Amino acid sequence: MSLFRAGAIAVLLLVTFLSACGEDSTSTPVQTFSERLEESFTVGDLSDLMVSNFAGTVVVRQGSAGVINVVAIKRAAREEDLDQFDVQMVALQNGVEVSTTNSLQLTQVSVDFEITAPLDVQPLIQVAAGSIDYEGSGIGQNSFTTAAGSVTVRLPADVNVEVLLTVGAGTISIGFPVVGLVEDQRIDGIIGTGVDGRIEASVAAGEIVVSPR
């Protein structure tokens, strides 16, 4: 089943994520124990970065040309739970696929990713409950999805891309002039000439922010 579905499932995921942080939404997450994993991959131009995460944050920043470096921080309320959910990092023909699984449906567990990648990497990032913070060029295909959380995309000030941004319950903020459809919960148009790439971001419950870096 896909990590992302709109409507009722998104709301359920949001409630589940908040309850994993404590008994109510104002509680501080009790994820005392952590485990750090790190791996580097050699890639070419316009490499692919595919990430799917059941809960947590995904942060992507510009790194060295030809290298994708992935740091995963597993977090859990109980030390014994750290071995009960998995992180996979697999080299593709020209890129990296990173995924997490929580087959036991544990609560109070998550994985935070800190990734550095070439500026021209093409991301496909999906998070069930959590946030995505991406900084890149916007070249090629760029896709970001979360059911409950936020998507932040930082692009060059002179970027030329198509954009399709949709939010089910929440807000969209964009720091570029857009030619096309601009509504509170949907933006479908172009920034600049739109010839260099495409940005797609979808959030069921939360916010989308697209801004110059």
Which residue stretches match the model-derived regions?
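Short, surface-exposed interaction patches in beta-rich subdomains
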Residues: 135-146, 150-213
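Short acidic/polar N-terminal linker immediately downstream of export determinants
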Residues: 21-67, 75-80, 103-110, 177-196
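Hydrophobic residues embedded in beta-strands of well-ordered beta-sheets
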Residues: 68, 94-96, 172, 208
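Repetitive beta-strand solenoid architecture
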Residues: 37, 45, 54, 64, ...
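Sec-dependent bacterial lipoprotein signal peptides
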Residues: 1-19
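Mid-chain, structured segments of secreted extracytoplasmic proteins
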Residues: 76-105
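Short, T/G/N/S-enriched strand-turn elements that build extracellular solenoid repeat scaffolds
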Residues: 38-40, 57-62, 87-88, 112-116, ...
